[in-house]
A protein has these predicted regions:
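Short, solvent-exposed coil/turn elements at secondary-structure transition points
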Residues: 40, 50-53, 96, 133, ...
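Alpha-helix N-cap/helix-start motif
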Residues: 56, 103, 123, 366-369, ...
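Serine-hydrolase catalytic core recognition
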Residues: 288-384
Length: 384
């Protein structure tokens, strides 16, 4: 068990502007830090040497900076630093202390960094914008609880995501010049709206399950006067939730489905509406998709029953995966690990449920029950 618990991990790949390098977080040095690799998976170099663990990294589209989140003492009061991409001293841009801060995203020109912070002291994770030219940060949206934001290509608008309550979220269209907001996701009862991305300044894609059971991909068009239109579904499944999506070249969208706890990749052609299956993933679980600047390549954080979490690259044209990182697993022979079986069963109220069963390899005496581990997840939104 100790050897299993010590297995390393790498995740959160982010491309350089020329797509020749990828930065990511890895536990390879013991304390998680930022590492860099060229995109053929060789030449791994440790970039940061913080005393505290790094939680995430985003390479600026302008190329000059890495935005890095660091957790002092491994706690919740995460701080954000700008690390010179070509080497140099990190600059802390958040105030430190008991303030919590989360990375959101860079503007497409690399001037602004959007992040969430409770620095205002109102109890919520508000949306902030840091200007790399002036070195100043300003709050752009107030949130009572958990919140984040995504910027339009011209950085004149943003989508503000807010958690209303457990299992219930909303998105709002924010005009940064006037600070006015318009609700994008009106609904009755509970609904999850998880991810939003601007296709252009006037078109939004989002994942949501408003008026349906499973999360799907939807589109919202913004009129010339700034008024958002209705939620229009453009890709969905009756047996899987849309876990994440990423815009690709030639008007295509990469869709990552969660089908009974296993990830499945597909591609949507925005013009025709056709959805085609993507290549089979090297492992069972995928997360953290990020597209290269030319949107022909993807980084993914892949893990599985016999695979530590690693950063991979997918060439979307050829369908070829390349492993970028190599998470340590000393003393653990991955080939001997049990692969699970998908099992379905009926609950007491007749609802069909599913889960992954790991059958213990029984050696020696067969007397008595084999060893068993029960893994309970923490809420209705997640799966274990």
């Amino acid at each position: 068990m100790a050897r299993m618990a010590a297995i390393g991990y790498s995740y959160g790949g982010s491309y350089s502007p020329d797509a020749k390098q990828i930065v990511f977080v890895s536990s390879g040095a013991g304390v998680p830090q930022v590492w860099r690799a060229v995109t053929d998976g060789v030449g791994l170099v440790q970039v940061t040497t913080f005393d505290d663990p790094v939680g995430g990294v985003l390479w600026s589209p302008a190329g000059e900076h890495l935005a890095v989140s660091v957790a002092p003492g491994g706690g919740l009061n995460t701080q954000i630093f700008l690390v010179p991409a070509q080497g140099g001293e990190p600059i802390q841009i958040t105030e430190g202390g008991q303030v919590n801060n989360w990375l959101n995203e860079w503007s497409r020109d690399g001037r602004y960094l959007a992040y969430s912070s409770n620095a205002a002291g109102n109890g919520g994770m508000d949306c902030w914008l840091y200007d790399t030219e002036s070195g100043a940060a300003r709050m752009i949206a107030i949130t009572d609880g958990i919140g984040s934001c995504q910027l339009s290509p011209d950085a004149q608008r943003a989508v503000v995501w807010r958690m209303q309550s457990r299992g219930n979220t909303n998105m709002y269209l924010l005009d940064l010049a006037t600070s006015s907001e318009q609700l994008l996701t009106p609904h009755v009862g509970l609904a999850l709206s998880n991810q939003a991305e601007f296709v252009n300044n006037d078109t939004l894609l989002l994942s949501t399950n408003i008026d349906r059971e499973f999360v799907a991909l939807a589109r919202i068009d913004i009129a010339a006067d700034g008024t958002p239109g209705p939620v229009n579904y453009i890709a969905g499944r009756d047996d899987a939730d849309l876990d994440s999506f990423e815009m690709l070249a030639d008007g295509k969208i990469a869709l990552m489905w969660d089908a009974a706890g296993r990830s499945e990749l597909a591609y949507l052609d925005l013009a025709s509406g056709e959805v085609t299956a993507g290549p089979e993933l090297p492992t069972e679980i995928a997360g953290g998709m990020d597209a290269s600047p030319d949107r022909t390549m993807l980084t993914l954080s892949l893990s599985g029953s016999a695979s530590p979490t690693n950063v991979w690259q997918l060439d979307t044209s050829s369908g070829v995966f390349t492993q970028i990182s190599d998470s340590a697993h000393e003393g653990v022979d991955l080939d001997t690990l049990v692969r699970p079986e998908l099992m379905t069963y009926t609950a007491h109220d007749g609802l069909e449920l599913s889960g992954w069963l790991y059958r213990a390899r029984v050696t020696g005496s067969t007397e008595g029950a084999p060893p068993m581990v029960l893994n309970f997840h923490g809420g209705p939104e997640g799966q274990s």
